[in-house]
Amino acid sequence: KIIYNINSGSNTIQWDLPSYTNSGTLSIKGSIDIYGISLESKTGVTIDNVPMRGAAGTFFSSINSEMMKYFYKNLNTQLIILQFGGNAMYSGITKKQIEYYAQNIGKQIKYFQNILPDVPILFIGPSDMSENVQGKMQTRHFLVEMINALRDTVINNGAAFWNTFEAMGGENSMVAWANMNPPLASPDYIHFSKRGADRIGEMLYESINN
């Protein structure tokens, strides 16, 4: 049993637990805000994920930067990976809206660079996405323009860009992935299947190593 008295302000508590530990209990007396619990080993790579389902990725710059800097430094962050753009491809989007969205993504990159100026940023672009055009599934209108706008913004802001769309095979590749046996994409022609997501992960890994 370990007892800590927490002072006002930001605090980090670290426990070094035996490798055979499989459960624990945290009890709190009084009022306290807990922003996160990280379970890590002394070796290997630790990934901290922010799974914002349906998000466009333009909200980071509204988060208190000093608080984020404190978190990232305590986590010893060595790489920031952003993957956004697909949820911004709503029906009826215009080129002007794509331009505005890309500029907003640029602000997010600058936000992270200001917090961790020495940490590289990798932006993963949208995959191919299909829509029904006169009874035929085709790459969504303006998707290529979205990808190009994001690529230019990311690179111009000093971050790395990985083109998922091109890695898949380019235009109408989502249809091909969905029609594979076993399928690498879902029947909605937007999302990957588990097997397809694994394959994309492998392709990204291979790109980084090469």
Locate the predicted segments by residue.
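Conserved SGNH/GDSL esterase-like catalytic core that processes O-acyl groups on lipids
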Residues: 1-104, 191
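Short, flexible coil/linker segments at or flanking structured domains
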Residues: 3, 35, 56, 68, ...
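Structured segments of extracytoplasmic/periplasmic soluble domains
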Residues: 40, 70-74, 83, 108-115, ...
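Loop/turn elements at helix/coil->beta-strand transitions in domains of secreted/extracellular proteins
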Residues: 45-46, 75-80, 116-121, 156-160
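Structural signal for conserved beta-strand scaffold positions within catalytic alpha/beta enzyme cores
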Residues: 49-51, 123, 163
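Catalytic His-Asp segment of secreted/periplasmic serine-dependent ester chemistry enzymes
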Residues: 65, 127-210
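Conserved, well-ordered alpha-helix/loop/beta-strand core segments that scaffold catalytic motifs
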Residues: 79-85, 102-113, 120-129, 148
